[in-house]
């Protein structure tokens, strides 16, 4: 969510890793196929787009705008779904404020705990491309852990 500079690095990298990428942003000047060639671009509010797209256990949601008007509805929709990954750009202070806002919207502590924020692996990333690599690394890690859990042998209690 957010047709921003980090998304311009993240989208093609994720496509190279065989993710089906959709960039969602209601701002028509930002969310264009010229800025995001080769990926699906949706010019709608994220919660409305998610309703149409459907979120499921194979979905990762990343918010990148720093704008609560855009990010919070997307996070709320993602946290009320079964997506395997939810990440939000921003500092620890921004993340704490986000937690307060989403709590007021009815998101529980348990639900909010699913948000990776600050987003990405802590690799000292600075540039948009480096931040994109750190985000994708975290998404790949989350996907691998989810698959491990699904494939783990089930032990029945006696």
Q: PLM features: residue spans?
A:
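Short, glycine/charged-enriched secondary-structure capping and boundary segments
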Residues: 13-14, 36-38, 75-78, 101-104
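Hydrophobic, well-ordered beta-alpha structural blocks that scaffold small-molecule cofactor pockets
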Residues: 1-57, 68-71
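A generic structural signal for alpha->beta connector loops
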Residues: 18, 38-39, 82-83, 111-112
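ADP-ribose/adenylate-binding Rossmann-like module
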Residues: 24, 60, 65, 76-101
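Adenosine-phosphate binding glycine-rich loop
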Residues: 83, 89-158
């Amino acid at each position: 969510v957010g047709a921003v500079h980090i998304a311009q690095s993240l989208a093609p990298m994720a496509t190279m890793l065989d993710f089906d990428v959709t960039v969602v942003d209601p701002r028509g000047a930002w969310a264009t196929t010229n800025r995001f060639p080769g990926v699906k671009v949706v010019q709608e509010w994220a919660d409305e787009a998610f309703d149409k797209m459907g979120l499921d256990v194979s979905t990762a949601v990343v918010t990148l705008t720093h704008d609560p008007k855009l990010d919070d509805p997307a996070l709320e929709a993602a946290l009320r779904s079964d997506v395997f990954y939810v990440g939000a750009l921003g500092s620890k202070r921004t993340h704490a404020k986000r937690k307060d806002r989403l709590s007021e919207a009815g998101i529980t502590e348990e639900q909010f705990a699913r948000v990776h924020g600050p987003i990405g692996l802590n690799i000292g990333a600075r540039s948009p491309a480096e931040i994109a690599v750190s985000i994708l690394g975290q998404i790949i890690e989350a996907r691998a852990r989810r698959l491990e859990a699904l494939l783990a042998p089930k032990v029945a209690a006696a």
